[in-house]
Amino acid sequence: MPQTPSVCVIGAGLSGLVATKALLDRAITPDVFEIGSAIGGNWRYDNDNGRSAAYASLHIDTSKDRFALADHPIPKSWPTYLHHSQVLAYL
């Protein structure tokens, strides 16, 4: 039987969370490292990691239908272009 690889994911922003989910879907449990105290990366306004470029009125520039993950839909009641706080809640 093949040995399960040891994997780490750097960052728990959108890309890091998607990578983590893909690994978990393949029965690989990664170690996830995030410099901030919570997930969200660039979508976390006032992120305590000091690296987020989010600003108070930030919205995504693509529709929620294009942004959503295939097996994790965005609520239909949410607007087409999400505010950063909604993106963070979605994550």
Stretches with model-predicted labels:
Residues 35-38, 42-90:
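Glycine-rich active-site loop/strand segments that organize a redox cofactor
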Residues 3-32:
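N-terminal Rossmann-like FAD-binding beta1-loop-alpha1 element of flavoenzymes
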